[in-house]
Regions:
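Glycine-rich phosphate-binding loops of nucleotide-dependent enzymes
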Residues: 4-279
């Protein structure tokens, strides 16, 4: 579980020298979550909390239940047991639309962009929940609908500047390198102005330089926007560098929950990562 060679994305001071980061109240709470598919238990009695402003990593071998956990949080899956509370509100009846409307944004392990559309247009799809004009008013593109479109496009331009993708704003995303497509997907999630951001393997398939860039953007989103982040990532160097807290799943069970240093030396975690994948 040592940091990956060449990965030093965080500009935070070394842990020994850095002041302890302070977090707000609990914004997301999962209690005794259980999820199964037929006879297979994907998640088995898992509980944890996420605090406002925190970067929480969920790690574990393949098949440990990490993506299933994110799917429960944003309403793709309905747990058979347990409760999920977001900002004091029960999510028992949560669905993806309601989750997005409530301030939960998500990126996916496999890129889910509109490949024939430009970077700008893909980012604009992340603003649809913010637009109040109806379909016909938007088609006419006049008056309030036009003003709303211009205001939302101006906001998207700030995202483009933040992610340093000005040069590809008009490029169809299907023509972009993989690393830039991942950055556009992050931008679309940020366009929703989420209070909590779920990132499913945001650096999968990236080279060292691309991982450094993505790590920097994740840290900046957290520090500049105050966005709470829950991420799944297999690169342990990145996880240990940018996370405030790490949860480890194995065969659907939580086997560790603590700071990166605490998790790094946990024998159960070491044993899980030395074992075979569970796929």
């Amino acid at each position: 579980l040592a940091p990956a060679e060449g990965i030093h994305p965080s500009e935070r001071p070394a842990e020994a020298d850095a002041p302890e980061r302070q977090f707000g109240e609990t914004v997301l709470k999962l209690e005794n979550i259980e999820l199964g598919f037929g006879g297979v238990k994907a998640i088995n009695d898992v509980s944890f909390e996420v605090r406002k402003g925190e970067i929480l990593a969920i790690i574990g071998p393949n098949g440990a239940g990490k993506s299933s956990m994110l799917n429960c949080i944003n309403g793709f899956y309905k747990p058979q047991k347990g409760t999920i509370t977001f900002n004091g509100r029960s999510m028992a009846t949560m669905d993806p639309y309601l989750a997005a409307s409530s301030g939960i944004a998500r990126t996916f392990q496999n890129i889910a962009l509109f490949r024939g559309m430009s970077t700008l247009d893909n980012l604009m799809t992340g603003r649809l929940l913010k637009m109040k004009s109806n379909f016909f008013a938007q088609c006419v593109y006049f008056g309030a609908a036009k003003r709303e479109e211009l205001e939302n496009r101006a906001f998207i331009e700030t995202i483009i500047d933040f992610l340093e993708i000005q040069s590809i704003r008009r490029t169809p995303v299907g023509r972009l390198p993989y690393g830039l497509q991942k950055r556009v997907e992050l931008g679309r999630a940020l366009a929703m102005e989420p209070s909590i951001l779920l990132l499913d393997e945001p650096m999968a398939g990236m080279n060292v330089e691309e991982k450094q860039d993505m790590s920097r953007f994740i840290l900046d989103v957290n520090e500049e926007f105050g966005t709470t982040i829950v991420l799944i990532e297999h690169d342990m160097g990145v996880v240990m560098d940018i996370s405030d807290r790490v949860i480890v799943l194995d065969y659907g069970r939580k086997i560790a929950d603590g700071t990166p240093d605490e998790v790094r030396t946990n024998q159960d975690v070491i044993d899980a990562y030395l074992g075979a994948s569970h796929d």
